[in-house]
């Protein structure tokens, strides 16, 4: 994985060898069939690719085709600007905004690793989709 700043966005981009396992970890087959996870966009959104190669962003919660937005920039080919404060960390809202969490409250923000992030995204999406059903 490579990560760092690209313009005003903090990106975490997965290596091609990681994409399949990361896509499985986020259970995209359940919520976005036919898409693969390419990376994270400023911690709040996944960057996903469809089977035609088009790139989109989608909120981590809720995951669903109705929330896809075409990515408005090309993924950088040049190195990202590293930021040691964030290497290996993903910002997570303890109570996601969708569930009434405050995005500016310091006590609602936690920094987790990639594996924890996958687990949290899956758990909260399961909660969202079960309530929606």
Where are these regions (language model features)?
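Nuclease and nuclease-like effector domains acting on nucleic acids or nucleotide cofactors
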Residues: 1-91, 95-133
């Amino acid at each position: 994985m490579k990560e760092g700043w690209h313009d005003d966005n903090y990106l975490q981009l997965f290596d091609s060898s990681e994409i399949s396992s990361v896509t499985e970890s986020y259970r995209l087959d359940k919520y976005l069939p036919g898409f693969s996870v390419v990376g994270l966009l400023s911690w709040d959104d996944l960057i996903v690719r469809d089977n035609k190669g088009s790139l989109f962003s989608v909120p981590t919660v809720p995951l669903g085709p109705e929330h896809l937005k075409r990515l408005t920039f090309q993924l950088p080919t040049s190195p990202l600007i590293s930021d040691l404060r964030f290497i290996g960390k993903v910002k997570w809202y303890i109570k996601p905004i969708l569930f009434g969490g405050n995005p500016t409250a310091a006590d609602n923000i936690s920094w987790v690793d990639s594996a924890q992030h996958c687990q949290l995204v899956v758990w909260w999406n399961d909660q969202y989709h079960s309530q929606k059903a």
